[in-house]
Design a protein with these regions (language model features):
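Mixed-charge, low-complexity interaction segments
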Residues: 1-135, 151, 161, 184
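Short Cys/His-centered divalent metal-binding micro-motifs
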Residues: 183-205, 269-290
C-alpha cells in the first residue's frame, strides 16, 4: 500500500510511527491460536489481529482520557496517570509496561499538538506530486478528482466521492506519523470507511455471508463497507493476478469465490480486476463496479 511522497521533514519526531511500534510490541505478546479443529485456520488469523487492534485503540483512548483529566497538573503527575491507565488495561513485566507508557506518552503528546498533520507546504508538495502522476486511490484504484481535470464535473465528484484526500496509512489518531512512508492518495469514500480503523479485521466481517447465488442478494450482503474491507485485506491488489487496482486499465471489479462449492462469505470471497475477466482467468464473477 505504500506510495512514497517527497517531502522535507525538519521534525523527525512528527514523522515517527509510534503507533506501529506499539502495535508490534502488543502483537508480540498476544498469543491467540486458532483452534486446530478449524480446517482453514489461516482464514481466521483476523481474530488475533482484531484483538491487537482493539488493545492498541483502547490504550490510546485511555491514555488521552488520563492526560485530559490531569491537564493542569505537573508533567510527572500526567506521566503517572498514563502509567496507571496502562496498568488498568494490561499486566506485562515492568520494563514492557514502561515502554508502552513511553510510547503512549509520545503518541498522546503528538495528537494533542496535531503534530502529525502536514504543514501547508508539505501538503501542497504531496498533492502536486500525486496530481502530476495522476495517482489513483491506493485502496480501491479509482480515478481521483484533483480539481483541475479538463472535464471536471463537480456534481459527479460529489456523487462519486472521488475527491483526492491524503491518507495516513497508520491513522494519526492511533499514533501514525506524517512521514512520507505513511502517506497515500485516497478517494473520499475509502478514507471515510477507513477512518481510524487499523485493518480490515476491525469490520464486522462475520456478518457477511449469503446462501444465495443471486447477484442482487449477494450485493446486499457485501455492501460498500464490506467491499472496502475486502479491498483493504488484499492490499489494493487483484486477488488473481496481483496487479494493483490503481494500475489496471479500467475500474471494473468482480467478486469471486475461492471455493465455488462454498457460499459467499467474507473468508471465501476475493476481488478480481477487469483484466482477469477479459483474460478468462475467472471461473465466475459478480461485477461489483463498472
Amino acid at each position: 500500500l505504500r506510495r512514497e511522497y517527497r517531502i522535507r521533514e525538519e521534525a523527525p519526531d512528527k514523522a515517527t510511527n509510534w503507533g506501529e511500534q506499539l502495535w508490534t510490541l502488543l502483537a508480540s505478546e498476544v498469543r491467540l491460536e486458532v483452534p486446530t479443529f478449524i480446517v482453514d485456520r489461516e482464514a481466521y488469523d483476523f481474530v488475533r489481529t482484531r484483538l491487537v487492534n482493539h488493545l492498541l485503540s483502547r490504550l490510546v483512548v485511555r491514555a488521552k482520557q488520563a492526560r485530559a483529566a490531569n491537564a493542569a497538573l505537573p508533567d510527572e503527575t500526567r506521566a503517572e496517570a498514563i502509567r496507571r491507565a496502562v496498568d488498568d488495561v494490561i499486566a506485562l513485566p515492568e520494563e514492557r509496561q514502561a515502554l508502552i507508557s513511553y510510547l503512549l506518552t509520545r503518541i498522546v503528546d503528538r495528537i494533542e499538538r496535531r503534530g502529525a498533520t502536514l504543514t501547508a507546504v508539505q501538503k501542497a508538495r504531496v498533492t502536486g506530486f500525486a496530481r502530476a502522476r495522476r495517482h489513483r486511490c491506493y485502496i480501491c484504484g479509482r480515478r481521483l478528482f484533483y480539481g483541475d481535470d479538463a472535464v471536471h464535473d463537480p456534481d459527479e465528484e460529489k456523487e462519486a466521492f472521488r475527491s483526492f484526500e491524503l491518507d495516513h496509512l497508520f491513522p494519526q489518531a492511533r499514533g501514525g506519523g506524517r512521514g512520507s512512508d505513511n502517506l497515500a492518495a485516497c478517494c473520499e469514500s475509502c478514507n471515510k470507511y477507513k477512518d481510524v480503523n487499523l485493518s480490515f479485521a476491525d469490520f464486522p466481517i462475520e456478518m457477511s455471508q449469503s446462501p444465495s447465488l443471486n447477484p442482487v442478494q449477494v450485493a446486499k450482503v457485501f455492501d460498500g463497507r464490506i467491499k472496502f474491507a475486502l479491498l483493504w485485506r488484499q492490499g489494493g491488489a487483484c486477488a488473481r493476478c496481483g496487479k494493483k487496482f490503481h494500475d489496471t486499465a479500467d475500474e471494473r471489479l468482480y467478486l469471486v469465490r475461492r471455493d465455488v462449492d462454498d457460499a459467499y462469505h467474507f473468508t471465501n470471497v476475493q476481488v478480481a480486476c477487469g483484466e482477469c475477466e477479459d483474460g478468462d482467468m475467472l471461473d465466475e464473477g459478480i461485477k461489483i463496479r463498472d
